[in-house]
Amino acid sequence: MARVGIVGGGAFGTAMACVLRRADHEVLLWAREPEVVAAIDGEGVNTLFLPDVPIAAGIRATNDLDETVRGRDFLLTAVPAQHLREVTGRMRAGLREGTPVVSCSKGIERGSHALMPEVLAETLPQAVVAVLSGPSFAREIASDLPCGVVLACADAAIGAYLARQISSTRFCIHRSDDVTGAAVGGVMKNVISIASGIAAGRRLGENARATLITLGLEEEIRFGVAKGAQPATFLGLAGLGDLMLTANSLASRNTSLGVALGEGRRLPDVLAERRQVTEGAFSVEGVAALARSLGVDMPITRALDAVLNHGCELDTEIARWMARVPGAAA
C-alpha cells in the first residue's frame, strides 16, 4: 500500500482518488474549496464537481496542501492548467527529493506557453515528472467503468513503478517514455474538440466534423513532432484515443463550448455559466503562438485563435479554413 497525495479536488482529481483507493492505497485529496472537503469527508461525494457519483470509501480530503505533499510515495496533480504553477510552487518546500509527480492536467500555460510537465520541471526540480493522459472522462472513471490511458515517464523504472501502483483491471495503463507527446495530446484534443463542436453548432454536417477531426490530428502530429515528441504517440491512446472521445462527445466541456459558439453565443457568456474549467479555451492562444514560433502550419488552430482571441467572424474563418483544405478550389 502506497501513501498517495492528489492535488486538485475537481472532477478528475476525485476520480483518480477513487482509482487509487480501489487499489488499496492510502489517499489524501487536497481541494482548494472547503465545501468540497466537507462534502467528501461528510457525505462521500464531491457535490461541487462530481455530483451524484458516490466515491470510494476511505478517501480523506483536506485543505492543507503541505499535509498532502509531505511523506507521500507519489503525487498526482489535477489542478487547472493556469493554476498549476502557483499551486506547485507552494508544494516545493515539502516535497522529498526523487518523489514521482504525475501531471493529469491537460493544458498549456498562458504567457510562458509551457506544457504541464515543463511547469512541473521548473517548479518542482526535485521531482520525477510523469504524465497521465488518454480517453478518460472523470464520471466514468469514478463509476469504475473500464478505461485505458497512457502513463509517460522518461525514467523507465519510475514509470513501471507508477503503472503497477495505479493500474487495475478496470483502469488499464499503457507505458510510454514520451512525456512531451502525452502532454501535447492532452492539449490538442481540447483545441480540436472546440472546432468539432463549432461544426456541430453551425450544422455543417458529420462529413465536415470528420474532416476537421482528421486534419486536426494531422496538426497535432506536426505540432508534437516540432516540440520533440514521437509521431507514434499520436496514433495511440494519448493522441487519437483522447481526440476520438473528446471531439465526438457533448459530455466534453470543450466540444459543448464549440457547439455553443457555433450556435452564435459569445465565449465570455458561455464560460461565465460554467463552474468547471474548459481548458481548450485557454490553450488555443498558446498553441497558436507556439506554432508560429516553431514554424508549424496549423490552420484550424489559427482560425480558432482568430475567432476566440482576436474578434474575427466565425463564418469568415470557416470559409478561409475550407479554402485551405487540400484539394479545395483556390
What residues fall within each predicted segment?
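General beta-strand structural signal in soluble alpha/beta enzymes
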Residues: 103, 128-133, 173-177, 236, ...
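NAD(P)+-binding Rossmann beta1-loop-alpha1 motif at the extreme N-terminus of oxidoreductases
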Residues: 1-53, 63, 90
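NAD(P)-dependent Rossmann-like dehydrogenase/reductase catalytic/cofactor-binding core
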Residues: 189, 196-200, 225-235, 239-330
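Internal alpha-helical scaffold of NAD(P)-dependent oxidoreductase catalytic cores
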Residues: 83, 94, 119-127, 146-233
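Rossmann-like NAD(P)(H) cofactor-binding subdomain of soluble oxidoreductases
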Residues: 55, 62-146, 162-164
